[in-house]
Structures are given as structure tokens and as C-alpha cells.
Swiss-Prot record:
Organism: Salmonella paratyphi C (strain RKS4594)
The enzyme's E.C. designation: 3.5.1.96
Statement: the UniProt record of this protein carries the keyword Zinc: yes
Protein name: Succinylglutamate desuccinylase
InterPro entries assigned: AspA/AstE_fam (IPR050178), AstE_AspA_cat (IPR055438), Aste_AspA_hybrid_dom (IPR007036), SuccinylGlu_desuccinylase (IPR016681)
Assigned protein family: Belongs to the AspA/AstE family. Succinylglutamate desuccinylase subfamily.
Source lineage: Bacteria, Pseudomonadati, Pseudomonadota, Gammaproteobacteria, Enterobacterales
Length: 322
């Protein structure tokens, strides 16, 4: 199964759907779904996902290289792993999504969207995670969902963590820093993301990793992701990574800007970078007689997008944590 990506992009079902690797067993579970189980007993389970948005190809290429290293035996596997290529049809077409944004659908929210390939896939992925986690006795559960951003950013690599009722474990946050993340953003409310689903329903330590800018297959400079790739290799092999000398900056979400109608106007242009700062009182958006302004001394924008569908998020506003 050293051609997992090619099979996923072509929509081809392999002739052989399970076999042996170098110190592990593999099972092809469906298009874009591959389970890896070490021969030796382990108590750690990891979801490694990419391609939830089909135009975010660098993380997919990164996972493909990690799989090649595992199959060649140059990388040892010490976790049960479910590899997920989230949206195969959008990946093959080179587009963000075919009908609707899947990363708003998890936790059953797909039921409120018009039926499409994405709603069916979101349901399939929910069931796949349920089966994966329920079939083992993992003491440690992680989910790393790899993305790239539409816009440039003041932080080249950053992580977005779902709302969580319990404190985050220090070793997980330390690993994110060792993986080269320059900033961590903490959600304060539930959402429809893949990582919120795995955290809420299975207690996984989950993070969406944003690793640079979205580019087509073959146009990615994977050297800029080398620190993350090396950290993933060490993680899979059970090798402790050195702590970052500069821990990631921390932010929390303080508000969400939502587009409700065609009257919506977001006062940020296409060159506005993620983590751009705005002073208190700045007008951020208008919709009819509703005005959205900065209420804290300084707020930072994340994922500004004026062209989202009505009812969806047009941006997040953040506050820097000490």
C-alpha cells in the first residue's frame, strides 16, 4: 500500500486491501482511509488527517512521504494510526470543496446541509473515527488535522485547538511547539470542525495545524514544512522531540463575524494577513444596521473571508493571551 495517495485520487479500489509492512499491519478501509497497526502492542492511537479541503495539498504530500518512509522501514511505527485523506473528490479536482465546506459539518451538523458528497463523507468519517477508537484500548488519543490557509499570515505555521472542558496536556502543547507552530489559537465554543468532533466525542487531544498557504499538487515547497515533517516522524517513531526555544504565542477566540445576508460587508481587503491587529473601536464589518467593531484594546483577525455562504463564519477575532 505504497500507492495510497494515487489510489485515493483515482478513486480506485486496490486489489489487495490488507497486508504487512515493516513492523506493522495495514488495512485499506475505503477511499482515503488507511489503518496502520504496529505488530507490538501499543496504547496510543493517532488520527493523521489532511485534505479536508481539496486545494490544501502540501499536507497530503507530506503524509504521502511519511507513509513511504514507514513502508520502506526507514521509519518505525509506535502508534495505532488512522490516516485520513478527507475529501478525495475535491482533492482530485483541485478545488476546496465540491458542494459545501466539510469542516463545518462534523458532530452531526452535516444533517443541516443539503445532501452532497461532502455530507456523506462527513458521516463516513465520523463512523470511521468511532470504529477506530472503539476497536482499541488506547490510553493516549491524538488527532492532528493538517491544513494550509487561503491567506498569508503573520505566523507561517499555527494551530487551532477546539473548545475543551479540561486543561490541555502539557506534552501535547509542547509537541505542537516542537512541530514549528508559531502560535496556538484556543476556541471557546463548540464548532463543526473535524478536530472538535474527535475531541468532544472521543476525548482526543486534537489540533488543526495550518502549515503555510494553499497551492496545487506539485507546486509545494515541502522544505518549508521540514520542521513539522521531522516532528511527525519522531512522533510516529516514539522519539521525544526537543522543546521549542520559543514557545508558540497563545490567542483565544473572543468573537466570530458571521455573514447573514447579501448586505454583509467585511472591511478587510484580500491582502489582510491572518493575525493582523486592529485597535479598539475599529469598524470590522457591517450588515444592514448591524455594525461589528473591536471591543478589546487590540484584536487580531483569523480566517477573514467576505465571500462565504450566508450563515457561515466570515472571520474570527482573537485576543492575545499572556
Amino acid at each position: 500500500m505504497d500507492n495510497f495517495l494515487a489510489l485515493t485520487l483515482s478513486g480506485t479500489t486496490p486489489r489487495v486491501t490488507q497486508g504487512k509492512g515493516a513492523g506493522f499491519r495495514w488495512r485499506w478501509l475505503g477511499h482515503g482511509l488507511l489503518e496502520l497497526t504496529p505488530d507490538a502492542p501499543v496504547d496510543r492511537a493517532l488520527i493523521l488527517s489532511a485534505g479536508i479541503h481539496g486545494n490544501e495539498t502540501a499536507p497530503v504530500e507530506m503524509l504521502d512521504k511519511l507513509l513511504s518512509a514507514l513502508y520502506s522501514g526507514s521509519l518505525t511505527l509506535t502508534w495505532r494510526v488512522l490516516v485520513v485523506l478527507g475529501n478525495p473528490q475535491a482533492l482530485a479536482a483541485g478545488i476546496r470543496y465540491c458542494h459545501s465546506d466539510m469542516n463545518r459539518m462534523f458532530g452531526g451538523r452535516w444533517q443541516s446541509f443539503a445532501e452532497s458528497d461532502e455530507t456523506r463523507r462527513a458521516r463516513e468519517l465520523e463512523l470511521s473515527l468511532d470504529t477506530f477508537f472503539s476497536s482499541g484500548q488506547a490510553r493516549v488519543r491524538w488527532h492532528l488535522d493538517l491544513h494550509t490557509a487561503i491567506r498569508g499570515s503573520h505566523h507561517l505555521r499555527f494551530g487551532v485547538l477546539p473548545q475543551r472542558d479540561r486543561p490541555w496536556e502539557a506534552d501535547f502543547l509542547a509537541w505542537l511547539g516542537a512541530a514549528g507552530l508559531e502560535a496556538l489559537v484556543f476556541h471557546q465554543a463548540p464548532g463543526g470542525t473535524f478536530t472538535h468532533f474527535s475531541s468532544e466525542h472521543f476525548g482526543a487531544l486534537s489540533c488543526t495545524l495550518e502549515l503555510g498557504k494553499a497551492l496545487p499538487f506539485g507546486q509545494n515547497d515541502l522544505t518549508q514544512f521540514s520542521v513539522t515533517s521531522q516532528a511527525l516522524s519522531a512522533l510516529l517513531s516514539g522519539i521525544e522531540t526537543s522543546t521549542s526555544s520559543s514557545p508558540p504565542l497563545r490567542y483565544r477566540v473572543v468573537s466570530q463575524i458571521t455573514r447573514h445576508s447579501d448586505k454583509f460587508a467585511l472591511y478587510m481587503d484580500a491582502q489582510t494577513l491572518n493575525f493582523t491587529a486592529f485597535a479598539k473601536g475599529t469598524l470590522l464589518a457591517e450588515e444592514g444596521d448591524k455594525r461589528v467593531t473591536v471591543t478589546h484594546d487590540v484584536e487580531y483577525v483569523l480566517f477573514p473571508n467576505p465571500s462565504v455562504a450566508c450563515g457561515l463564519r466570515a472571520g474570527l477575532m482573537l485576543e492575545r493571551l499572556p
